[in-house]
Structures are given as C-alpha cells and as structure tokens.
Amino acid sequence: MTPIDAKRPLQLNDQGQLRHFLSLDGLPRELLTEILDTADSFLEVGARAVKKVPLLRGKTVCNVFFENSTRTRTTFELAAQRLSADVISLNVSTSSTSKGETLFDTLRNLEAMAADMFVVRHSDSGAAHFIAEHVCPDVAVINGGDGRHAHPTQGMLDMLTIRRHKGSFENLSVAIVGDILHSRVARSDMLALKALGCPDIRVIGPKTLIPIGIEQYGVKVYTDLAEGLKDVDVVIMLRLQRERMAGGLLPSEGEFYRLFGLTTARLACAKPDAIVMHPGPINRGVEIESAVADGKHSVILNQVTYGIAVRMAVLSMAMSGQNAQRQFDQENAQ
C-alpha cells in the first residue's frame, strides 16, 4: 500500500479537482456548487427508459459498509450502476472483519482486487480518512458516513433538496432539530450551509444533545422548539441515535417527542411554505408525527431521489479527478 503524498491536499488533486470525498470541511463553495450542478444534470437520467450513462464503464466501485444502511448503500449502488460501473458490495457480517481481521488488512485485500473506488461506511470517526491516506494513489475513496464525524454525500443531497425547492441559500433560515450531538449529518449540513452562504443556521434540541462549542460552526443554539422554528424556511429533523448514546442523556423517547417532536401545530411556527426534511430512517412518534412526515411540507422522498443524482456526481467527479492527477503525475515524471 502506498501512502498519499503528504504535500498534496487529501481530498483534491493538484488542479483543485475532487479525488476523494471525505468531508465537507474546507471544500470551497465553487466545488460544492459544481457538485450540485452536476447532480442536477444527472436527475434526468432517472427518468429515462434506460437509466445509464457510460462515464464509469470499465471501472469497479467497491461498497465497503461496516455499518448497516438501506438508503445510503442502495443509492450508492444505483448511482454506480447508472454510471455503468461494476459494483461489488462487501457483506461485513460475513466478512473476515467479523473474524478479527483489521481494517488495514481488509483494505489490503480489497486493493488486491483492483477496485477503482471504495465507498466506505464505518462506525469509527476518521475511518474513511485512514483508508484514503493508505490506499493506492489511483484509488478514490468516498465517505459514506464515519462515526459522528461526517456524512458528506448526505450533506450534499440535503443541499440539492434545499436548492431545488428554495432556489438560493442567500436569504434562508434553516433549523436542524434533534440529536445534534451524535449526528454526522448535522455536522455535514452545517458545514455545507455555511459554505454556500446561508445566513441563518439554527440548531434545536435538549442541552444534553447539543455539543459544547457548536457555535464555532456559525450557528444559533435553541433549546425551545417553537422559538427555534420561528419563521424558518427549512426544517431538518434528525433521528435519535440510541445506539450511540450513553445512559442518562434523555429521560425517555416520549419526553423527547413532547418537547421536540415535530407536529403540525409546531410546524406552524415556521414559514407557511417551509419544507421538512429528514435523513432517515424516520422514527414516527419520536422526532416527527406521521401527518408531517407524509404531509404537503415534506420533501423526504425527494431527498432519496436526489441522493442518487448527488452520488452519481461525486463518483464521476472523483474518478475524473483521479484520472487527471494520474495524467499530471505521468507528464511531470517524463
């Protein structure tokens, strides 16, 4: 395995193009806008009789999911297939990692299969960065979610959803509600919203589920739902992540719903044309009532559709960036 050149930005090639997609932290607005524009152009592919374009023909994308997922894994598979790539999905529950093999050894074996791209989802923060730092330089790494750290493609599909329904970020008020402390989606959304120029980003939740120092992301903190939702354009609800919680952070799910669950009455605090989003899976009656999740303000299913296009954009752009870097290195080696 060959460590990446320490002088080269990990996510970008020497021309500033995407070569890995690990986090939204530090990526310029122009690149995020390019991802959104590229995803927009891919949306029509899903409406075709033959839902394929040949951009990744002959390439192999390996989905390495160490955490369970339905939407993320399926949409990455569909995205790669629609780009005409060959797709391998590793079933971690039956893989050697469940028998004691380390992440490093698993990576070495996958690399020996000559995959061109890894999509990695892992419970440990930083796992995708670790792989990108040690993988062969010709292989692109996409973060499908790592611990509490980042979920960059979810962040970008949320941005595409907002842009398609609201047009611009410049005058928006966006509220992110719920379990902020354990949410990699919240972090990615905050970074993307700030980079794209959203002037009013709010986080709402109980004090025990809001991380200390979150104001550094340029957000306003609210512990009262009605106050935080006042006149917002976008409401992003988050799932309570019981699997990541230590005891004592919440009295009960019922108490959380009583104070922070999104109901029709509470949504009335937002603007009349506000949209409601959720990364899924939804816990009905815990963070959101069914009347809201299935109602006229909800764009939750649109998020799933847009997720395929965003992941097509990221896969194609990262592969293009890898190819450009390879050509650049070859020319400069002569």
UniProtKB/Swiss-Prot annotation:
Q: Which residues bind carbamoyl phosphate?
A: 71-72, 121, 151, 154, 280-281
Keyword terms = Pyrimidine biosynthesis, Transferase
UniProt-listed Enzyme Commission number(s): 2.1.3.2
Is DNA-binding a UniProt keyword of this protein?
A: no
Q: Name one GO biological process term.
A: 'de novo' UMP biosynthetic process
* Keyword Transferase annotated: yes
Query: Which parts of the sequence bind L-aspartate?
Result: 99, 184, 239
Q: Which reaction does it catalyse?
A: carbamoyl phosphate + L-aspartate = N-carbamoyl-L-aspartate + phosphate + H(+)
User: Which InterPro entries does this entry report, sorted A to Z?
Assistant: Asp/Orn_carbamoyltranf_P-bd (IPR006132), Asp/Orn_carbamoylTrfase (IPR006130), Asp/Orn_carbamoylTrfase_sf (IPR036901), Asp_carbamoyltransf (IPR002082), Asp_carbamoyltransf_Asp/Orn-bd (IPR006131)
* UniProt-listed PROSITE patterns: CARBAMOYLTRANSFERASE
Pathway per the UniProt entry = Pyrimidine metabolism; UMP biosynthesis via de novo pathway; (S)-dihydroorotate from bicarbonate: step 2/3
What GO CC terms are in its UniProt record? cytosol
Q: Which GO terms describe its molecular function?
A: amino acid binding; aspartate carbamoyltransferase activity
Q: According to the lineage, what is the superkingdom?
A: Bacteria
How does this protein assemble?
A: Heterododecamer (2C3:3R2) of six catalytic PyrB chains organized as two trimers (C3), and six regulatory PyrI chains organized as three dimers (R2).
* Function text: Catalyzes the condensation of carbamoyl phosphate and aspartate to form carbamoyl aspartate and inorganic phosphate, the committed step in the de novo pyrimidine nucleotide biosynthesis pathway.
The family this protein is said to belong to: Belongs to the aspartate/ornithine carbamoyltransferase superfamily. ATCase family.
The protein in question is named Aspartate carbamoyltransferase catalytic subunit
Species for this entry: Pseudomonas putida (Arthrobacter siderocapsulatus)
